Amino acid sequence: SNYGASLHKKSMRGWMWHGGSPKEDIEDNLRVLRERSRDAYMGVPLATGAIKTMRTNVVCGGLTPTPQIDNAFLGISDEEAQKINEQIAREFALWANKPTCDADRIDNFYMLQQLAFTGFLLNGDSWAVLQNKKTPGVPYDLRVRIIEADRICSPAFMDILSPTDINEHHVEKIVQGVETDADGMVIAYWVCDRHPLASTSVTGLTASHWTRVEAYGKKTGRQNVLCLMQRERAGQLRGVPLLAPVLESLKPVSYTHLR
C-alpha cells in the first residue's frame, strides 16, 4: 500500500501501532489523560488560553430561554401569547438568576454552564445531577449539582465486565462508572461520595462509598443525570479531554521558562 497502511515506506517503518476497543484505547487511559490535561491547564499558558477562549466563545453569556408558545394551537390571541411568554421568561429568571439553583449554592445557572463546559474540555465529559430540595423563600425546588468527571467511576475503581452483584444491585457491566444492561444501553451511573484524588481518599475506598444513580427515574422517566460528552467511536462511554492529542507537544512548552 502507498497509503497509511504501508509497512515498507521509511516514514512508516518505525510506527508501532496497537488497536483496541474504545475501552482499551480510551477508558483505560482516562485517569492519566485527565490529570495531565488539568496540569497543563494550570501550568501551561498556551493550554490555559485555549480552554478559556473556547469556553468564552461557546458559552458566552449562557443559554437563555426564548418562549414562543403556539397561540394558534392554544386558541388565544397574539397579545395573550405575548403575556404568557413574558411570564415564562420571568419565572425562569426567578430560578436561574440566583445561586439557589446550584446545589452548592455558589453559582447561578449561567455560571454553572461555564463550569460544566470547562469540565467538559478539561476532562472529556462533564456531569450534572438534577436534585429537588425545598428551601424557605425559594419557589422552585430544582437544584443542579455539577460533578467532576473523576467521581463518576466504577466501584472500588474496578470495571465490571461480567454479571455480578454490587451493593445489593445486580449489574451486567460497569465501565468507568457507566452501567449498561445486557443490550449495551446505559441504565445507571456510579458516583463516588468524594473526589477519588482527594487526600482523604488515598486509602480505604470500598464499594460502599459509591452510590448508584439511575439514568432515568422509574416513575417520572425524567433524566436524573446529564452528561456533556462528544463521542468519537461507537461503544464509547466516556469522553476524551480536548488537550489529549497535544499533551506531548505542550510538555516542552512548560519548560520554556528554564531556557
What residue ranges belong to the model's regions?
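Extended, Lys/Arg-enriched charged tracts that mediate electrostatic binding to polyanionic substrates
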Residues: 115-197
